[in-house]
Every structure is written in C-alpha cells, then in structure tokens.
Amino acid sequence: MKITCIVTILALLSLASKAQTQGINKNYNAQLAKALNADDYGMKKYVLVILKTGSKSDLPKATRDSIFRGHMTNINRLADAGKLIVAGPLDKNALNYRGIFIFDVEEIEQAKALVETDPVIKSNLMAAEYLSWYGSAALKETLKIHSTIEKVKP
C-alpha cells in the first residue's frame, strides 16, 4: 500500500512538472515582450478600423485628389508617430469597404480621435467602423520592417 501511494505521488509530481514546463517557449524574449506590451501569449489589444464609402461622392476631381493627398499625408504622420500599425486599401467589394487601419491603441475612443484627423473622414468621402481586436504584439514591428523594404514613400 505504501509503495502504491509513493509511486502514485511520484507519478503525479512528474505529470505536474511536465504540465508546468509544457508550452513554455524556449525563444521567449521577456525584454522584447515588455517593450511591445505583450501579454503572456504574445498578444495585445488594438483597434481595427474599416473605412467604407461615405455620404459625399459628388466632389470635383481636383478636390478629391487634394483630399486623398491629405489622406496619405495623415497616414504617414500617424505611422511615424507609432499609432498606425497597418493601413491599406481593399479591392472593390459589395460592402463598399474601402480600406483598413489597425491602431496601436486599446480603446475605440482613442482610435476615433485619430481617424477624425483624416481628410477623407472630415470630408465624408469615407466613414469608419471601429472594432476592438486582439492580435500579435509583434505586429508593431511591421513599421520597422516596412521602412526597409519601401522603395518609394507615398
């Protein structure tokens, strides 16, 4: 009976030890995780913004062109400030979605304040939908990498 109990205890301790070490990433970089505000899963909260066709569409071409130049300038400003992590257009679609932004902010209100600085939003050429999104904290590194592969800056 004593031997059975001892063997059972040793087996349970062995299983508990394996459970604790299982899933631990050998490549884990605590300093980088902290710098990127990553949680234990390497993830963090962002705000995903879907840009869609707005209520204003009858502007002269010269005005639209000027607004879109301002839009690109604003994108670059927000990216340079480290707030805008991903931005890009979408192909034509039935939902009239035009593009996306992913902001390195946790609250939708913070993203709204940033989006409201964009000329396409101010002019109502586009409107925005906001969603909280939980994704890889490494996404923030995209900007550093992108700047090394971008031959022409828009």
Predicted feature locations:
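Conserved, structured core segments of small domains
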Residues: 20-154
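Bacterial Sec-dependent N-terminal signal peptides
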Residues: 1-24
